[in-house]
């Protein structure tokens, strides 16, 4: 199992979820030691990671770049779905993007 992503309310209520059954999110992530990454490197493949409204615009920019740089077609396709999910959450008060690691 991969790193699932969900939009959730501040109470933790699930609004929408994207499953990563083929472990594709990790193919878009930089190394944890990559200091040029502001958000993506902190997605924990084995734990939970939450991005708030101040972080989401930066996350979206980084994700677009990761998708553009990828050569893995399945990862690109999944990244596009993840991007749409993040954009849906962006700008919505008390709404978060949560990643649930394996």
Task: Please place each PLM-identified region on the residue numbering.
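Acidic (Asp/Glu-rich) sequence patches and key acidic residues
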Residues: 1-102
